[in-house]
Design a protein with these regions (language model features):
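N-terminal targeting signals for export/organelle localization
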Residues: 1-51, 187
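A short beta-strand-turn-helix
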Residues: 48-69
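Conserved redox-active cysteine motifs that mediate thiol-disulfide chemistry
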Residues: 73-90
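Short pre-active-site segment immediately N-terminal to redox-active cysteine/selenocysteine motifs
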Residues: 67-69, 73-77, 147
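Extracytoplasmic/secreted envelope proteins and their assembly/folding machinery
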Residues: 54-61, 85-92, 114, 118, ...
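Thiol/disulfide oxidoreductase modules built on the thioredoxin-like
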Residues: 83, 134-181
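Conserved hydrophobic packing residues within short motifs/helices of P-loop NTPase cores
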Residues: 71, 105-107, 152
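Conserved segment of the thioredoxin-like fold in thiol-based oxidoreductases
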Residues: 93-135, 145
Length: 187
């Protein structure tokens, strides 16, 4: 009972804190583009119409060729996801300030209600995809993801260098930073 009350209180606090006025998100299609958008802003991306579920991850990673891609699978209703985003913010900011080729990508599905998602993402710098249930569930199934948050890191060539699919959750600042550095230094 106490755990439930604590969890509900935490979820309420996270929800209320995400209601603060934040910068507006920009929308962009998923066709390959030049890297003209500001990496320290919020960019909404969409997948090409009719893309097979098997190609979703490859398509997203391909958008960021030449960059290390840190993917966060999350949902607006997930308290641990929101907590993890707060934890990774200083790491993200340090790479953005250093102008390192690192893209932070956030993927969720329709279980994150559209209005809540639109209200939440302005406080989360990076690239955002909100997939259909079919796309999101298919992607989670294909990767073997059983829970969120889950992280996946690809190097500048699009090759996986790290994931925590088996265990899920936020792996910690040290692991995330070490894996980003590993990916940046990979030839």
């Amino acid at each position: 009972m106490k755990k439930t009350l604590l969890l509900l209180t935490t979820a309420l606090i996270v929800s209320l804190s995400s209601c603060a006025k934040q910068p507006q998100a920009t929308t962009e299609n998923a066709a390959p583009t030049e890297k003209t958008e500001k990496k320290d802003s919020v960019i909404v991306k969409t997948l090409p119409a009719g893309i097979p579920v098997d190609d979703i991850l490859k398509t997203i990673i391909k958008e960021f060729k030449g960059e290390v891609v840190v993917i966060d699978f999350w949902a607006t209703w997930c308290g641990p996801c929101m907590y993890a985003m707060e934890q990774i913010d200083p790491i993200k900011d340090s790479y953005l300030k250093a102008e390192k080729p690192v893209a932070f990508v956030y993927i969720t599905g329709e279980t994150s209600p559209l209005a809540k998602w639109q209200q939440t993402i302005p406080g989360i710098k990076g690239y955002h995809y909100r997939l259909t249930d079919k796309e999101f569930n298919g992607l989670l199934r294909d990767l073997g993801i059983r829970g969120i948050p889950t992280y996946y890191i690809a190097d500048k060539n699009g090759q996986r260098v790290y994931d925590n699919i088996a265990e899920g959750g936020y792996p910690g600042d040290e692991i995330i930073t070490a894996q980003i550095e590993n990916a940046l230094n990979k030839k």
